[in-house]
């Protein structure tokens, strides 16, 4: 029987508070944008299936982390069991861009001995007239850390699918090459799930959400 999904990838979304992490994830998993969003307390959990090639689906387990300092000790615990992530900054908030280095350094400390595949995301690109960070300097920073760079807008649904799908494809290619392997005791990558019964296509493509506070 064909697996519903080939692999499960655990992803984290990190960045300063108010950069729009929760809005981006909800746009991707639920297809909606909330004008008002309460700050994440601790960690929120979402999931969605992504078809990277015809008939090849990856289940994404996405962890939305709180950006406030008082919750950082909680969110750090989720770094080690993630294989990939989106690192967000707000293009209208230069401080959030300046803090990208701090987020990356913190992640390196807590993921050992593993590594996380990151994509740098300049969020809220619909507010281009208020931009405080140029695309050029963001691309330069991303290149310095070996990351891809993409600009997104949860409000206008710009590049949201692309950000998650591109990251998923990059991880999948690393798994196929053997650069990333399934390891006992590590939740970053899991092998596919085969159900006991055949589900309809409507049942397969679902998003689910759980809040861990």
Curated annotation (Swiss-Prot):
SMART domains named in the record: RAB, RAN, RAS, RHO
Cited PROSITE patterns: RAB
Q: Where is the lipid attached (S-geranylgeranyl cysteine)?
A: 211, 213
| Known regulation of activity | Regulated by guanine nucleotide exchange factors (GEFs) including C9orf72-SMCR8 complex, which promote the exchange of bound GDP for free GTP. Regulated by GTPase activating proteins (GAPs) which increase the GTP hydrolysis activity. Inhibited by GDP dissociation inhibitors (GDIs).
Instruction: State whether keyword Protein transport applies.
Output: yes
* Residues that coordinate or bind GTP: 17, 20-23, 37, 40, 67, 123-124, 126, 154-155
Residue positions annotated to bind Mg(2+) are 22, 40, 64
Question: What GO biological process, any one, is recorded here?
Answer: synapse organization
InterPro entries to which the protein is assigned, alphabetical = P-loop_NTPase, Rab39, Rab_GTPases_membrane_traffic, Small_GTP-bd, Small_GTPase
List residues modified as Cysteine methyl ester: 213
What is catalysed by this protein?
A: GTP + H2O = GDP + phosphate + H(+)
Any one GO MF annotation of this record: GTPase activity
Write out the ranges of the annotated region (Switch-I): 35-43
Q: Which residues carry this modification: Phosphoserine?
A: 201
List its EC numbers.
3.6.5.2
* Family from the record: Belongs to the small GTPase superfamily. Rab family.
Q: What is this protein for, i.e. what is its function?
A: The small GTPases Rab are key regulators of intracellular membrane trafficking, from the formation of transport vesicles to their fusion with membranes. Rabs cycle between an inactive GDP-bound form and an active GTP-bound form that is able to recruit to membranes different sets of downstream effectors directly responsible for vesicle formation, movement, tethering and fusion. RAB39B is involved in autophagy and may function in autophagosome formation.
Subunit notes for this chain? Answer: Interacts (GDP-bound) with C9orf72; C9orf72 in complex with SMCR8 acts as a GEF for RAB39B. Interacts (in GTP-bound form) with PICK1 (via PDZ domain); a PICK1 homodimer may allow simultaneous association of RAB39B and GRIA2 to PICK1 which is involved in GRIA2 trafficking. Interacts with isoform c of RASSF1; the interaction is strong. Interacts with isoform a of RASSF1; the interaction is weak. Interacts with the DLG4/PSD-95. Interacts (GTP-bound) with HOPS complex components VPS39 and VPS41.
Q: Tell me the domain comment.
A: Switch I, switch II and the interswitch regions are characteristic of Rab GTPases and mediate the interactions with Rab downstream effectors. The switch regions undergo conformational changes upon nucleotide binding which drive interaction with specific sets of effector proteins, with most effectors only binding to GTP-bound Rab.
Q: What NCBIfam families does the record point to?
A: small_GTP
Name of the molecule in the record:
Ras-related protein Rab-39B
Question: Origin organism of this chain?
Answer: Bos taurus (Bovine)
């Amino acid at each position: 029987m064909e697996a519903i999904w080939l692999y499960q990838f655990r992803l984290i979304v990190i960045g300063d508070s108010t950069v729009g992490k929760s809005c981006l994830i909800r746009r991707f998993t639920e297809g909606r944008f909330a004008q008002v969003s309460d700050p994440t307390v601790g960690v929120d959990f979402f999931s969605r299936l992504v078809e990277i090639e015809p008939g090849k689906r990856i289940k994404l387990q996405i962890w939305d982390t709180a950006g406030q300092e008082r919750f950082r000790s909680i969110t750090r615990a989720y770094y080690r069991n993630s294989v990939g992530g989106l690192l967000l900054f707000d293009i209208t908030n230069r401080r959030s861009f300046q803090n990208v280095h701090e987020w990356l350094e913190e992640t390196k400390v807590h993921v050992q001995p593993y590594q996380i595949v990151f994509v740098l995301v300049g969020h809220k690109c619909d507010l281009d007239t208020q931009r405080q960070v140029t695309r050029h300097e963001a691309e330069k920073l991303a290149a310095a850390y070996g990351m891809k760079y993409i600009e997104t807008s949860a409000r206008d649904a710009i590049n949201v699918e692309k950000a998650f799908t591109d990251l998923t494809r990059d991880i999948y290619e690393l798994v196929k090459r053997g650069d990333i392997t399934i390891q006992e005791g590590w939740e970053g990558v899991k092998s596919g799930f085969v159900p006991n019964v055949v589900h309809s296509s409507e049942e397969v493509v679902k998003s689910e959400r759980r809040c861990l506070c």
